[in-house]
């Protein structure tokens, strides 16, 4: 009996230990994963924004309160090495996240976990298309977008003005990075079409000119003055500071930003004849795959292109039926038809040129021809 008791005593003690301490151990395990997850996400946000003062300011008005401190108040400058380092950093974050047990996170944390993993994986896929991105597109390129972002840059304190001026000062380096990227893109045989390069270069020369800066009417001058006036009115700026900032802004626009934009225009024109493909992405080696990646990146959907196409077709058919039903209901209620083109089972025109001509004829009542308007010069 004593031997049996001695044999069962260790087993009993182990069972008792597990009953008492196992919940605490499991709780600590859950706490560890959750704490590590929060640490990883905080580090990811900080590493993503601390080198991009422009993006950071639009995301957070007071980043210091979130423990995020700028490494340098400058625009991020492209280099092949920096791009590779960024991809390596994303891979590192994804690898660390894979060690976590997402089941130990709460519902909100699991949702963030899934989103972050998908985002990092998607960003890493982009490295397969190194030179397919076009930052200088004539439709929405940085040659115009960056200046518009500067115009919308909010000033909450005088420190924001200092950061803004530092960003203007970094524009030449930023442009050099853009030209380096476009040169590498050209060497890879993926430079934009000649017509697009010419349009982008023309935009560089037109959106910022010596004449508008001399007259003080450029939008980067007028919006800057307006934002300073707002700070002055709130008592966050002195008259002396306002005058000093106005002078610095004028100097940087004339001596840094304008020459950089002229350099960008020259660089695009020099590379304009190096584009080897015409007809858009579909004609480039991995153009279709990059387009599929773009759709996934833009929509957040994991559906294939064929699946998305079918969804769109179903939606178009549903919308078309609803339009026909609305027209039928209108006719039943009023006995007439609205002043719109009749809805037929098939679109009356199929030739692209004929469709555009028909549209131009229909829009004349609401939008008169340019020749009928008085020519006026619009200053931004």
What are these regions (language model features)?
Residues 12, 23-380:
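N-terminal maturation segment of proteins
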Residues 2-19:
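N-terminal Sec-pathway targeting helices
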């Amino acid at each position: 009996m004593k031997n049996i008791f001695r044999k069962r005593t260790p087993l009993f003690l182990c069972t008792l230990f597990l009953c008492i301490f196992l919940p605490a151990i499991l709780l600590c395990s859950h706490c560890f994963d959750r704490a590590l997850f929060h640490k990883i996400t905080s580090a990811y946000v900080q590493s993503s924004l601390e080198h991009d003062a422009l993006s950071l300011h639009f995301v957070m008005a007071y980043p210091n309160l979130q423990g995020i401190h700028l490494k340098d108040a400058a625009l991020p400058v492209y280099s092949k090495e920096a791009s590779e380092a960024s991809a390596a950093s994303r891979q590192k974050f994804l690898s660390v996240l894979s060690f976590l047990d997402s089941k130990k996170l709460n519902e909100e944390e699991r949702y963030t976990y899934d989103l972050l993993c998908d985002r990092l994986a998607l960003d890493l896929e982009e490295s397969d298309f190194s030179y397919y991105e076009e930052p200088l597109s004539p439709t929405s390129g940085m040659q115009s977008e960056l200046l518009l972002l500067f115009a919308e840059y909010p000033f909450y304190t005088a420190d924001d003005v200092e950061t803004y001026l530092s960003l203007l000062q970094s524009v030449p380096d930023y442009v050099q990075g853009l030209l380096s990227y476009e040169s590498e893109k050209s060497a890879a045989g993926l430079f934009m079409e000649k017509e697009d390069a010419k349009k982008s270069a023309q935009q560089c020369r037109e959106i910022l000119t010596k004449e508008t800066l001399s007259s003080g009417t450029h939008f980067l001058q007028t919006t800057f003055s307006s934002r300073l006036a707002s700070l002055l009115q709130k008592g966050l700026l002195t008259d002396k500071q306002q005058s000093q900032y106005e002078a610095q802004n004028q100097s940087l626009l004339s001596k840094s930003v304008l020459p950089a934009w002229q350099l960008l225009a020259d660089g695009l024109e020099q590379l304009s004849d190096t584009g080897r493909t015409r007809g858009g992405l579909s004609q480039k080696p991995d153009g279709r795959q990059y387009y599929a990646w773009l759709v996934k990146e833009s929509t957040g959907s994991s559906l294939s292109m064929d699946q998305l196409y079918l969804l769109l077709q179903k939606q178009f058919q549903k919308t078309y039926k609803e339009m026909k039903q609305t027209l039928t209901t209108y006719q039943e209620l009023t006995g007439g038809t609205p002043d719109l083109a009749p809805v037929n089972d098939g679109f009356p025109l199929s030739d692209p040129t004929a469709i555009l001509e028909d549209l131009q004829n229909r829009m004349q009542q609401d939008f008169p021809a340019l020749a009928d308007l008085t020519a006026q010069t619009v200053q931004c």
